[in-house]
Regions:
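Conserved N-terminal beta1-alpha1 strand-loop-helix module at the mouth
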Residues: 1-69, 73-77, 88-101, 107-115, ...
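Extracytoplasmic beta-rich repeat domains
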Residues: 79-81
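His/Asp/Glu-enriched short active-site or ligand-binding loop at hydrolase and phosphoryl-transfer sites
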Residues: 116-121
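Charged helix-capping and loop-helix junction motifs
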Residues: 124-131
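A short, hydrophobic beta-strand element within the central beta-sheet of small alpha/beta folds
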Residues: 140-142
Length: 172
């Protein structure tokens, strides 16, 4: 059964009480005061908290979050970036790594041993992404995730461990 990471896109703390959501993703570009309030409330409820965005490592460290989801898909030196994150955040931090939707890149990023590998999914080309995720899960022990980049994406048909949705899309 898929687990959900819900990306918080608006100042809404009501999802913290949803027992089906175990992990939240805070955007480093969002208001820091809100991120701090949300993190405190989510921590009290026993939820995991990750950060994303350009300043994800800094936000993670500042607020004492559990880890980050970092986009390595555009990075020409992903190993150096990943090693920086591991050193900056510590060995116990959770790191989810977004990869390009290609087998070679998925294998390369997996060599760094992230906690989970994130594939990006759009409605256009969804079948190719489904096939890629299925192939990946057949070969690797690292958990896989899909990051829904569009609304109304049929994520239920993915053979993945984790689905990352925005708070607008999470309506289960």
């Amino acid at each position: 059964m898929q687990k959900f990471i819900v990306k918080i896109t608006s100042e809404n703390i009501s999802l913290i009480d949803d027992s089906r959501v175990e992990c939240f993703l805070l955007d480093s570009a969002a208001d820091t005061a809100f991120n701090r309030r949300f993190a405190e409330a989510a921590r009290k409820a026993g939820k995991l908290l990750l950060s994303c965005g350009d300043k994800a490592p800094e936000l993670c460290r500042e607020l004492g979050l559990d880890g980050v989801v970092v986009d390595l898909s555009k990075n020409e030196k992903p190993k150096a970036e990943f090693q920086f994150l591991r050193n900056f955040l510590g060995k116990d931090a959770v790191i989810g790594a977004v990869t390009r939707n290609r087998r070679h890149e998925a294998m390369v990023i997996s060599e760094f041993e992230p906690d989970f590998l994130v594939f990006q999914a759009w409605n256009d080309g969804i079948e190719q992404v489904r096939e890629l995720v299925s192939w990946y899960n057949g070969l690797f022990l690292i958990q896989s995730a899909i990051l829904c980049r569009e609304e109304n994406l049929d994520y239920a048909g993915f053979d993945c461990d984790i689905v990352i949705l925005s708070d607008r899309e999470y309506t289960i």
